[in-house]
A protein has these predicted regions:
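Beta-strand elements within well-structured catalytic alpha/beta cores of enzymes
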Residues: 39-44, 79-84, 167, 188-201, ...
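Short glycine-enriched loops at secondary-structure junctions
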Residues: 85-89, 99-100, 145-153, 201
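N-terminal secretory signal peptides and thylakoid transit peptides that target proteins
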Residues: 1-14, 21, 27
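Surface-exposed, charge/polar-rich loops and edge strands
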Residues: 162-163, 173, 187-189, 194, ...
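A short aromatic-anchored loop/beta-hairpin motif
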Residues: 25-137
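A short secondary-structure junction signal
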Residues: 53, 169, 175-181, 206-211
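Long, well-ordered alpha-helical scaffolding segments within enzyme catalytic domains
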Residues: 59-70, 176-191
Length: 296
């Protein structure tokens, strides 16, 4: 308990009578641990070529570092919750491990892709708060920090000194389901939890591969069009159109599978009415978007 909270509790003590229910008193004091409302992030975790790169090696990685520095200056971060495109499950799980492993969930890359470690501690106590807010979410310790988390976090918080845990994406549910579920995480923002949706507005592996592996990094055109459409909806705060992305003629081309798109929906579900939204980075590669933004 912070000193200021102790003093407030001390001041209340004379007013606690036998007739005052413990539950009511608990309700008063439950707000003492609240902190300044945390922002919410949506970010890409970069393309595979970014993984072995050091700090500030390109503009995208520099932007991640700048975001992390700014948030640490303005907020006291208790823990980070990452909703990663790389942890898809049947049902929704939350990792309550105290020491999450570094997961290399990619294949066929040079040795330097498999030697890096991001040894941030977990936050079991905070992770269990998720199951209290959303009882259908189940606990597990059989996961760690995957490609959607540590390659981004090692630039945003390079000291790995902020506790991190992940929540999975139920692959078999609709975009609207995820939007409604994510709303229930809002109380965590008042408890010092930085929530990050890590995915990509545009992520078509098949089409990206056709150009990436030939050294052609020029976008197709349709990828830019969809990415800009998303930006326009963000600026208009037309969140429902973003949730209903499959109705856009390019929606299922830009996101043929939901895994990388759904983290965007989680981040947007946490936005309050009239809350600010700042575009933090914008870059297009073939069939792949590095767009990111900060809410709050």
């Amino acid at each position: 308990m912070h000193r200021k909270d102790f003093l407030r509790l001390l001041a209340l003590t004379p007013f606690v009578t036998h007739n005052m229910k413990l539950q009511a008193f608990s309700k008063i004091t439950s707000s003492f641990s609240s902190t300044k409302k945390m922002p919410v992030l949506f970010t890409s975790h970069g393309n595979p070529m970014d993984i072995p790169l050091g700090l500030n090696a390109n503009p995208f990685l520099t932007s991640l570092a700048q975001i992390g520095e700014k948030i640490r200056k303005e907020h006291e971060i208790k823990a980070i919750l990452v909703v990663s495109a790389h942890w898809c499950t049947k049902g929704t799980l939350v990792n309550v491990s105290s020491a999450p492993d570094t997961i290399y969930d990619y294949y066929g890359f040079p040795p330097e892709y498999y030697t890096q470690k991001y040894l941030a501690p977990g936050s079991p106590e905070t992770a269990k708060e998720v199951t209290k807010l959303i009882p259908k979410v189940k606990e597990t310790t059989e996961w760690g920090l995957d490609h959607g988390a540590w390659p981004m976090l090692k630039h945003m918080f390079p000291k790995a000194d902020v506790p991190v845990f992940e929540m999975s994406i139920d692959y078999y549910q609709s975009a609207q389901y995820h939007f409604d579920l994510a709303k229930q995480l809002k109380p965590l923002r008042d408890k010092g939890v930085l929530i990050i949706g890590s995915g990509a507005v545009v992520h078509n592996i098949k089409e990206a591969g056709k150009r990436f592996f030939n050294g052609n990094m020029k976008p197709y055109g349709w990828d830019i069009e969809f990415d800009q459409w998303i930006k326009q909806q963000l600026d208009k705060r037309d969140i429902q159109s973003i949730v209903n992305y499959e109705k856009n003629k390019l929606g299922l081309i830009a996101a043929p599978t939901p895994d990388h798109y759904v983290p965007l929906i989680y981040s947007l579900a946490l936005m309050e009415k009239d809350e600010s939204l700042e575009h933090t980075f914008e870059e297009m590669l073939p069939a792949f978007s590095n767009r990111g933004f900060k809410i709050g």
